[in-house]
Amino acid sequence: MPFYGGEELATVYDEALDEGFGLIASNIAEPNIMMGLMEGADRMDSDLLLQMSGGACRFAGDGDAVAGLKAMGNYIETIAERYDIGVFLNMDHQTDLEFIEQQIELDIPSSIMIDASHEPFDENVATSREVVEMVEAAGSDVLIEAELGQIKGVEDEIEAEEAFYTDPEQAVEFVDKTGADLLAISVGTQHGVAKGKDLELRPDLANDIRQALRDHGLDTPLVLHGSSGVQPDQLQEMLKHGICKVNKDTRYQYEYTRTAYDRYNEEPNAIVPPEGVADARDTFFNETDWSPNKDVFDPRVAGRDIRERIADVHADLTEVSGSAGQSLFK
């Protein structure tokens, strides 16, 4: 299926709100993660929302975020054609307005998340509204996600030492003034490595925010950031209250590295010289009796394991979130 835009993504969110499921928004720090995500989503008949941060774009573009976005956009579009699901791209935690304007002009993302949550309320409103107006001026169908409240932890070099819960009435004012299509709320999750048992999650607050918005005629999809440590039962409880986009990044990063670590530790002497053999990498071990084993160190060997593991993890997450079997583009 094609790599879709904001208009089609909006229909997925409408369905998610109606049916009570969540779309797992999955960050791609590296291409093998993307490949695994596509395989896992297709296996479970779930539409797929990929995400890229500014840091991921710079990494893909060797320091040039625009080049990285173009390269990954082409890659996603080409690979997405092989699968019978809808594939979308959200730009996660964007703070650079110039880069956001370039994203809109390139017409690559399906949606963009403007993160001005660290600013005072009025400045957050003004910045978020400015991005919405960029989309309107361009005649684009890109959806805009904005954040109100602050989530503790570090995400793509954005650090918050404290968490500030989202106020329901302020949420109504924020959505009304900004025109944001989606609202990311702070209800006790945490960016980075966090344990669900240690999180003070507030499904009651998510419910209050959802109800306050609906009371004012705003059927705005809610977004849960910092969910890698949230346990299945906790997530399913949150999904009952208007959450229909659930961000995952840290979990995939860990699974990527752990899978490679496990693979290489199965046969360490095929990669690293055993004790007593000189570590003569500069001559590629020409003068030693030992040689590395290409069948083990070929990066595609670990890469295939990584793709398979990411696919399995994402497939499990679609079952937990309820998006399995819900693709609108099958």
From Swiss-Prot:
InterPro entries: Aldolase_TIM, Class_II_FBP_aldolase, FBA_II, Fbpase2. Keywords: Glycolysis, Lyase, Metal-binding, Zinc. The active site is at D92. One of its GO terms (molecular function) is zinc ion binding. Induction: Expression is highly up-regulated in presence of fructose. It catalyses: beta-D-fructose 1,6-bisphosphate = D-glyceraldehyde 3-phosphate + dihydroxyacetone phosphate. Optimum pH is 7.5. Zn(2+) 2 binds at D115, E145. Zn(2+) 1 binds at H93, H191, H225. GO terms for biological process: glycolytic process. Its cofactor is Zn(2+). Binds 2 Zn(2+) ions per subunit. One is catalytic and the other provides a structural contribution. Dihydroxyacetone phosphate binds at G192, G226, S227, S228, N247, K248, D249, T250. It is an enzyme of class 4 (lyase). Pathway: Carbohydrate degradation; glycolysis; D-glyceraldehyde 3-phosphate and glycerone phosphate from D-glucose: step 4/4. Disruption phenotype: Loss of growth on fructose, but growth on glucose is slightly stimulated. Loss of growth on acetate, D-xylose, or Casamino acids. The keyword Zinc applies. Catalyzes the aldol condensation of dihydroxyacetone phosphate (DHAP or glycerone-phosphate) with glyceraldehyde 3-phosphate (G3P) to form fructose 1,6-bisphosphate (FBP) in gluconeogenesis and the reverse reaction in glycolysis. Is required for the utilization of fructose as a sole carbon and energy source. Plays a role in gluconeogenesis during growth on acetate, D-xylose, and casamino acids. Belongs to the class II fructose-bisphosphate aldolase family. This is Fructose-bisphosphate aldolase class 2. It comes from Haloferax volcanii (strain ATCC 29605 / DSM 3757 / JCM 8879 / NBRC 14742 / NCIMB 2012 / VKM B-1768 / DS2) (Halobacterium volcanii). The lineage of its organism: Archaea, Methanobacteriati, Methanobacteriota, Stenosarchaea group, Halobacteria. The gene is fba.
